[in-house]
Amino acid sequence: RLMQVVGSRGYERVEPPLVEFEDSLLSGAGQDVALATFRLMDPVSQRMMGLRADMTPQVARIAATRLANAPRPLRLAYAGPVLRVRGDQLRPERQFNEVGVELFGTEQAEADIEIVSLAANAFMAIGVTDLSIDLNVPTLTTMIYDAVGMDDATAERARLALVRKDAAGVAALEGEAARIL
């Protein structure tokens, strides 16, 4: 159902390979997951291959290469299994499904708003209630303050409430700001 929601919002599904040659899989942003990547030898080419530990770098590479000439903004969605050498405290499992969306070629704050809205709608579509999303993008909150016509004093109260994760303080804001934030 998640993929149906993102598809209905114009996100095209891409399916990166589960196994790739190491020089492709771990290039660019893929370097960040090198230590988490299972490796194996391809018996035909005698080259090292890796099982993806994160699909995001693969999708970024697809956007930059095969879809380099596609019109922007480019909206891509993906879902599939990933495998990591070891889990961590937050996610001890080594194999799990990853679902994501990427938006390339648009203003940062606008893209952030679209992605957050899409995530909220997708989670509601699968029955998640009382959703709380933590944002750490100063440009996004400033854009929200401007969009709802918030004066400087109210913007400062909103900023402090958000920093403190004070739901009552956010709810006490005037107008549309409380609903959006």
Positions of PLM-derived features:
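Extended, charged alpha-beta segments that form solvent-exposed binding/catalytic grooves
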Residues: 1-181
